[in-house]
């Protein structure tokens, strides 16, 4: 139950608001007049019919909450932390002291303890940290700039591709907007047709109503005219049938429009497919780009291989020079031996012959060395020719760049032409919109004419029977004219169907051309894949040739080393011969003969080695010739591929020109057809005007219906023509976009090298400037750091004492914050226990009151306090008396009650205290955080 239903009169004034409910105040006040400002006056002004007023407590001026006074139950928290009482004076009563309370620590807080200054001391450490960060940042910058120089070139190329893609997306969005505009125009035309149909239905209803009125009036006038009216009604029924046929035709036209909308959707799907094909072509073009880059890399590798061959040839030249020097040294030694032999006259002629043989062999060796030198010179000439061929290829590439630029200009011209055509088409659409507005005006005029017809219809009732007969004759004539017009209309429909059939045939032809182009593209892709395979095979062959060549070079080096060893052995033997000649002049002839035989054998071995080397050189020549042939074949294949690509591009351009010519011819034919239609329309309009002059009210309405149907046909035709022109423009745009994309990519690939070189030069200049500026800034920072190092050395002595002060102040603040938190939790617990006790008491009272109202006897074990049974409000044996004038008691919870100033003041005071406590708490937390950071930084571990 609600609280207001149980309280007696004036009991709410004795309650105090709490977050849970109302609390009874003390019953110490009297019902006297207000004597002091703290006494609460009687708000009822002594109503006689109201119940007795409850005694109220005289409140003190400072009605703040004291946790020790309000709550009686003990706290459930741990008393490990002492309580802090800041502004509580010591109580004079020694008997009422709470022994559970701990000593007050505010006096300890007020002691003059030397506190640290964390902000000032932290600046030094922050500066040191900045110094270390600066050193690391320099290293990272130096490494990062090196990577950035390599990465920016790739990023610039990617940005170019991204910009092209964005431009293409923008063009596609514009085309979609144009498409939506045409669809909106189509919707407006459909709405206009619906309006015309509604008007036709309204006219038919008016005709029916007027015919009924005429029939009702003529029955009163004449009975003989009924037959004539029936005849007129039959004729009107026939006319209605004709109207139904016209409506059926209109429905057929609507169905045709639906079919056309489906065709539009199918064509949109085709557009999406074409866009997907464009994306595939783009991906194929990118693959071709990668292939070209791969070929360029192979050319670079081969140039590097040629350079390596040059280096190896230079090494061979050095080895040959060393051999020549050795041969010269051997000649000098032989000359010395000859002089010695001349001095010794006892030497025989056989030894002289041996010496001549040795000289001849040495001369042969020199000739072989000269031949090898000539071969090396020839190889160098071949290398120079290869380098010249490479330069020629580079010049051809530059020529291709210029050709691509000219083709780009041609494409720009074609783009301009297409844009002009698009503008013309837009102007035509504007003119057609103007025609639509003219038609709307004509429809309004027809509405006015209908209003006039309504007026004239009332006058037509007085027409005589003779005029009705003449009208019948005119109706027959008009029926014949309608038949003629229907025949013409059927002929026009046949012509339209034939043209639609021709248009479908042209569309099928265009689709066949598209398929052929796609097949050519697939063939080109297959050829490119074949060329890739050939290039890979050639690369593997060249790799094997390199390995064989290196093996042969290693074998030659080994042979040369063996030759050197043999030469050294011969030198040792010559020295031994000298010694033997000095020792034994008698045995010289025998030993020399043996030595000469050995030398002959050695010379034969050397000649065999030379022959082997010559064979190896010839094999190397054949390998080099093969390599040249393969290289020339690759060049010829590349030239053929490029020639084929150029031919394909020319064929595509010719096809574009042919398609443009076809479009022009189609446009001209469409214009001629439109003019013929206009002429026919004018002739028909003249015939209709002639018939309209002869007809009267009923025939006028039929004529209007026919005119409206014709206008609908014209609108449908215009709509169809607009859709056809739109689709043709879309096809042209797609073709031009594909050609543009190809040529742009080719141009960008060829211009990348020049742009990259310029970008790298600009970057190098910027890097130099940045390095100079960084060097100057580093010098200045070094000076500042040296000065600060001197200051830091002076401050190191004071750090130890400051660390102790920081630790002491940190733990002291932490301790006091925990103590305050514990005291706050105790207060909250006591308050909640008190609120629970009051709530349980209130529930018990409510149950007792319910039992009293229902006359339920008390149980034997009554748990309520005796105070509640003795009160004059809540006793069991005292009936609850309601006031007589209940309407005057407007101080319950259901009535608006005015707040007293005291409650507002207490609320404001509580808010101010909470604000102060929050401020102090925030400042203590900030101070704790600063001290913790300082302690961690001083201990050597930093956690960020």
UniProtKB/Swiss-Prot annotation:
<feature type="short sequence motif" description="Nuclear localization signal">
    <location>
        <begin position="54"/>
        <end position="59"/>
    </location>
</feature>
<keyword id="KW-0597">Phosphoprotein</keyword>
<dbReference type="Pfam" id="PF18520">
    <property type="entry name" value="Spc110_C"/>
</dbReference>
<feature type="region of interest" description="Disordered">
    <location>
        <begin position="23"/>
        <end position="110"/>
    </location>
</feature>
<feature type="compositionally biased region" description="Basic and acidic residues">
    <location>
        <begin position="96"/>
        <end position="110"/>
    </location>
</feature>
<keyword id="KW-0539">Nucleus</keyword>
<dbReference type="GO" id="GO:0005737">
    <property type="term" value="C:cytoplasm"/>
</dbReference>
<dbReference type="GO" id="GO:0005634">
    <property type="term" value="C:nucleus"/>
</dbReference>
<feature type="modified residue" description="Phosphothreonine">
    <location>
        <position position="18"/>
    </location>
</feature>
<keyword id="KW-0206">Cytoskeleton</keyword>
<feature type="compositionally biased region" description="Polar residues">
    <location>
        <begin position="28"/>
        <end position="46"/>
    </location>
</feature>
<feature type="compositionally biased region" description="Polar residues">
    <location>
        <begin position="67"/>
        <end position="78"/>
    </location>
</feature>
<comment type="function">
    <text>Component of the spindle pole body (SPB) required for the proper execution of spindle pole body (SPB) duplication. Potential role in cross-linking filaments or anchoring other molecules. It is essential for growth.</text>
</comment>
<keyword id="KW-0175">Coiled coil</keyword>
<feature type="short sequence motif" description="Nuclear localization signal">
    <location>
        <begin position="726"/>
        <end position="731"/>
    </location>
</feature>
<dbReference type="InterPro" id="IPR040593">
    <property type="entry name" value="Spc110_C"/>
</dbReference>
<feature type="modified residue" description="Phosphoserine">
    <location>
        <position position="529"/>
    </location>
</feature>
<protein>
    <recommendedName>
        <fullName>Spindle pole body component 110</fullName>
    </recommendedName>
</protein>
<feature type="coiled-coil region">
    <location>
        <begin position="119"/>
        <end position="799"/>
    </location>
</feature>
<feature type="modified residue" description="Phosphothreonine; by MPS1">
    <location>
        <position position="64"/>
    </location>
</feature>
<feature type="modified residue" description="Phosphoserine; by MPS1">
    <location>
        <position position="60"/>
    </location>
</feature>
<feature type="modified residue" description="Phosphoserine">
    <location>
        <position position="80"/>
    </location>
</feature>
<feature type="short sequence motif" description="Nuclear localization signal">
    <location>
        <begin position="742"/>
        <end position="747"/>
    </location>
</feature>
<keyword id="KW-0963">Cytoplasm</keyword>
<dbReference type="GO" id="GO:0005816">
    <property type="term" value="C:spindle pole body"/>
</dbReference>
<comment type="subunit">
    <text>Homodimer. Component of the SPC110 complex containing at least CMD1, SPC29 and SCP110. Interacts with SPC97 and SPC98.</text>
</comment>
<feature type="modified residue" description="Phosphothreonine; by MPS1">
    <location>
        <position position="68"/>
    </location>
</feature>
<comment type="similarity">
    <text>Belongs to the SPC110 family.</text>
</comment>
<feature type="region of interest" description="Calmodulin-binding">
    <location>
        <begin position="900"/>
        <end position="927"/>
    </location>
</feature>
């Amino acid at each position: 139950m609600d609280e207001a239903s149980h309280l007696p009169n004036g009991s709410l004034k004795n309650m105090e608001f709490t977050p849970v409910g109302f609390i009874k105040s003390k019953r110490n006040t009297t019902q006297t007049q207000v004597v002091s400002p703290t006494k609460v006056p009687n708000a009822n002004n002594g109503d006689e019919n109201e119940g007795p007023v409850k005694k109220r407590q005289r409140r003190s001026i400072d009605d703040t909450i004291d946790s020790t006074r309000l709550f009686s139950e003990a706290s459930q928290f741990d008393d490990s932390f002492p309580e802090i009482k800041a502004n509580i004076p010591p109580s004079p009563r020694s008997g009422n002291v709470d022994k559970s309370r701990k000593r007050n620590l505010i006096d300890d807080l007020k002691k003059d303890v030397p506190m640290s200054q964390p902000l000032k001391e932290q600046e030094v450490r922050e500066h040191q940290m900045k110094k270390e960060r600066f050193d690391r940042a320099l290293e990272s910058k130096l490494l990062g700039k090196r990577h950035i120089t390599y990465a920016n070139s790739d990023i610039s190329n990617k940005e170019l591709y991204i910009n092209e893609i964005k431009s293409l997306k923008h063009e596609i969005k514009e085309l979609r907007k144009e498409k939506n505009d045409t669809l909106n125009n189509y919707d407006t035309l459909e709405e206009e047709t619906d309006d015309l149909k509604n008007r036709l239905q309204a006219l038919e209803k008016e005709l029916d109503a007027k015919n009924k009125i005429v029939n009702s009036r003529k029955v009163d006038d004449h009975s003989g005219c009924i037959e004539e009216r029936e005849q007129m009604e039959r004729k009107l029924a026939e006319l209605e049938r004709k109207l139904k046929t016209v409506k059926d035709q209109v429905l057929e036209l609507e169905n045709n429009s639906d079919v056309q909308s489906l065709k539009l959707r199918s064509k949109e799907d085709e557009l999406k497919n074409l866009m997907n094909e464009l994306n595939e072509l783009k991906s194929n073009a990118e693959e071709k780009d990668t292939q070209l880059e791969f070929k360029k890399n192979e050319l670079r590798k081969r140039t590097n291989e040629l350079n390596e061959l040059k280096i190896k040839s230079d090494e061979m030249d050095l080895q040959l020079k060393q051999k020549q020097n050795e041969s010269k040294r051997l000649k000098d030694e032989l000359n010395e031996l000859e002089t010695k032999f001349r001095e010794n006259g006892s030497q025989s002629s056989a030894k002289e012959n041996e010496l001549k043989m040795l000289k001849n062999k040495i001369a042969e060796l020199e000739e072989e060395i000269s031949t090898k030198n000539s071969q090396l010179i020839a190889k160098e000439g071949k290398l120079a020719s290869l380098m010249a061929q490479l330069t020629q290829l580079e010049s051809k590439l530059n020529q291709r760049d210029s050709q691509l630029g000219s083709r780009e200009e041609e494409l720009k011209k074609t783009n301009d032409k297409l844009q002009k055509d698009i503008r013309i088409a837009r102007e035509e659409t504007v003119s057609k919109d103007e025609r639509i507005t003219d038609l709307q005006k004509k429809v309004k005029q027809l509405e006015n004419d209908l209003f006039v017809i309504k007026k004239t219809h009332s006058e037509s009732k007085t027409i005589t029977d003779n005029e009705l007969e003449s009208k019948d004759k005119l109706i027959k004539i008009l029926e014949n004219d309608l038949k003629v017009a229907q025949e013409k209309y059927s002929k026009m429909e046949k012509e339209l169907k034939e043209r639609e059939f021709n248009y479908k045939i042209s569309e099928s032809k265009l689709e066949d051309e598209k398929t052929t182009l796609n097949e050519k593209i697939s063939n080109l892709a297959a050829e490119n894949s074949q060329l890739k395979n050939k290039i890979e095979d050639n690369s593997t062959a060249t790799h094997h040739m390199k390995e064989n060549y290196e093996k042969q070079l290693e074998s030659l080096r080994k042979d040369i080393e063996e030759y050197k060893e043999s030469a050294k052995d011969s030198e040792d033997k010559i020295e031994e011969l000298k010694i033997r000649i000095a020792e034994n002049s008698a045995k010289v002839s025998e030993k020399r003969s043996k030595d000469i035989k050995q030398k002959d054998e050695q010379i034969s071995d050397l000649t065999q080695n030379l022959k082997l080397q010559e064979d190896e050189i010839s094999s190397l020549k054949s390998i080099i010739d093969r390599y040249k042939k393969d290289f020339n074949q690759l060049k010829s294949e590349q030239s053929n591929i490029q020639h084929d690509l150029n031919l394909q591009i020319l064929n595509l351009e010719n096809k574009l020109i042919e398609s443009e010519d076809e479009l022009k011819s189609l446009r001209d034919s469409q214009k001629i057809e439109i003019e013929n239609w206009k002429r026919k329309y004018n002739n028909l309009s003249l015939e209709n005007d002639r018939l309209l002059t002869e007809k009267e009210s009923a025939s006028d309405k039929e004529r209007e219906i026919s005119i409206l149907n014709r206008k609908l046909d014209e609108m449908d035709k215009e709509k169809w023509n607009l859709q056809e022109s739109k689709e043709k423009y879309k096809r042209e745009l797609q073709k031009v976009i594909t050609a543009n994309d190809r040529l742009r990519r080719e141009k960008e690939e060829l211009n990348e090298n020049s742009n990259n070189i310029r970008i790298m030069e600009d970057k190098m200049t910027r890097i130099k400037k940045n390095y100079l500026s960084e060097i100057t800034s580093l010098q200045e920072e070094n000076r500042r750091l040296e000065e600060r190092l001197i200051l830091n050395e002076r401050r190191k002595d004071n750090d130890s004492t400051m660390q102790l002060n920081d630790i002491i102040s940190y733990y002291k603040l932490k301790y006091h914050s925990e103590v305050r938190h514990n005291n706050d939790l105790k207060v909250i617990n006591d308050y909640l226990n008190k609120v629970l006790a009051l709530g349980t008491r209130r529930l018990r009272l409510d149950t007792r009151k319910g039992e009293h109202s229902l006359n339920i006897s008390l149980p034997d074990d009554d748990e309520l306090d005796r105070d509640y049974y003795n009160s004059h409000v809540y006793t069991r044996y005292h009936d609850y008396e309601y006031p007589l004038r209940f309407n005057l008691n407007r101080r319950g919870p259901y009535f608006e009650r005015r707040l007293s100033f005291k409650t507002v003041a207490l609320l404001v005071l509580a808010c101010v205290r909470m604000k102060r406590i929050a401020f102090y708490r925030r400042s203590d937390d900030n101070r704790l955080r600063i001290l913790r950071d300082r302690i961690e930084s001083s201990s050597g571990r930093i956690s960020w």
